Swiss-Prot record:
Belongs to the rotavirus NSP5 family. Its cofactor is Mg(2+). This is Non-structural protein 5. Homodimer. Interacts with VP1. Interacts with VP2. Interacts with NSP2; this interaction leads to up-regulation of NSP5 hyperphosphorylation and formation of virus factories. Interacts with NSP6. Participates in the selective exclusion of host proteins from stress granules (SG) and P bodies (PB). Also participates in the sequestration of these remodeled organelles in viral factories.
Length: 198
């Protein structure tokens, strides 16, 4: 099995952040302009902290939720994505905050030179031979433990005791008294062997 991958040139991603007005740039892949500009509002963290600390926990309602506070709304706005009719892709990868006086523009350009070429060749052959050996070594027979055989009689109706029998485990008037005691002795031997093995 052989797998060859030719990666002469991986996809190159170039990202540039401009602080001035957004300029229309053309992507080498789609031919569409990508870019955006937006006025950012810088929050006053000190005023927000004073505002939240001045309120009691009982007075905090839905209007004071995390999505409405100035810090989170600023974060949502700074990470927003805007597209227009000419734009194919627009994204914001910058984590730094912008001052309120400047206009931010993030531009991402994707260029694929040769792409990735994959050539895979798979050669496999499977051969299965099924030869069963019927000869067993004598050591296998010696190592195997032999348990006493228990023969089950088909005529179980003949083992039913009559009314004169006692319930103490002794069979006095059984039709097959000798077979009963032999079977009971075998069962005892099997039970003792199992206990020893455990």
């Amino acid at each position: 099995m052989s797998l060859s991958i030719d990666v002469t040139s991986l996809p190159s991603i170039s990202s540039s952040i401009y602080k001035n007005e957004s300029s229309s740039t053309t992507s080498t892949l789609s031919g569409k302009s990508i870019g955006r500009s937006e006025q950012y509002i810088s929050p006053d963290a000190e005023a927000f902290s004073k505002y939240m600390l001045s309120k009691s926990p009982e007075d905090i309602g839905p209007s004071d939720s995390a999505s409405n506070d100035p810090l989170t709304s600023f974060s949502n706005r700074s990470n927003a994505v805007k597209t227009n009719a000419d734009a194919g892709v627009s994204m914001d990868s910058s984590t730094q905050s912008r001052p309120s006086s400047n206009v931010g523009c993030d531009q991402v350009d994707f260029s694929f030179n040769k792409g990735i070429k994959v050539s895979a060749n798979l050669d496999s052959s499977v051969s299965i031979s099924t030869n069963v050996k019927k000869e067993k070594s004598k050591n296998d027979h010696r190592s195997r433990k032999h348990y006493p055989k228990i023969e089950a009689e088909s005529d179980s109706d003949d083992y039913v005791l009559d009314d004169s029998d006692s319930d103490d485990g002794k069979c006095k008037n059984c039709k097959y008294k000798r077979k009963y005691f032999a079977l009971r002795m075998r069962m005892k031997r099997v039970a003792m062997q199992l206990i020893e093995d455990l």
